[in-house]
Amino acid sequence: TGTSSAAIARAGHRVLASDFSAGMMAEGRKRQPHIPFVGADATNLPFTSDSFDAAVISFGLRNVVEPRKALSEMARVVKPGGTVVVCEFSTPKNRAFRHIYSRYIMGMLPHVASQVSANGAAYSYLAESILAWPDQEGLREWFLELGLERAQYRNLSGGIVALHRGYVPHA
């Protein structure tokens, strides 16, 4: 919906938002009319190599059928020295908190969502996809395997979310 794109644009950067979902792009265009949106498959981006200073995906990589391929495509379209950033649900580091969180995600979230949402199944998918997603070190390894340099992450909200970044190497 362009939420992270809007924040980046407010910081003074030129932004081109893309999404696979026409519905998400329509909502994004409504919410962020000043940002251009392009329909794109994350695993086959319609941009030339080395086109952007950065590529950012927020809460979307987990939903791509081939997330490693999408991450590779993000790196491909970023100029050497540029940044690839992924903001995604992750794994709380504190063991007790992780246990409580996992029980909430798999137990309560789908149940509560089915009571208040017309699409309760989406919340079951959300819970399952979060728990199946690699932890912080696992996603960091993906960055390194793709050749991104200085791959690192920062936990947000106790590790419920992690912000990963890596840099495209200079040739």
Specify the residue positions occupied by each region the protein language model found.
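Class I SAM-dependent methyltransferase SAM/SAH-binding core
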Residues: 1-45
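C-terminal alpha-helical "lid/dimerization" subdomain adjacent to the S-adenosyl-L-methionine
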Residues: 3-4, 87-146, 152
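Class I S-adenosylmethionine-dependent transferase superfamily signal
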Residues: 8, 73-74, 166
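A short hydrophobic/small-residue beta-strand
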Residues: 15, 84-85, 150
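A short acidic, Gly/Pro-enriched loop at the edge of an enzyme's catalytic core
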Residues: 43-54
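A short SAM/SAH-binding and catalytic strip from SAM-dependent methyltransferases
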Residues: 53-67, 90
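A short glycine-rich, Lys/Arg-flanked "PGG" loop and its adjoining helix->strand segment in the class I
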Residues: 68-83
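Core SAM-dependent methyltransferase catalytic element
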Residues: 140, 146-171
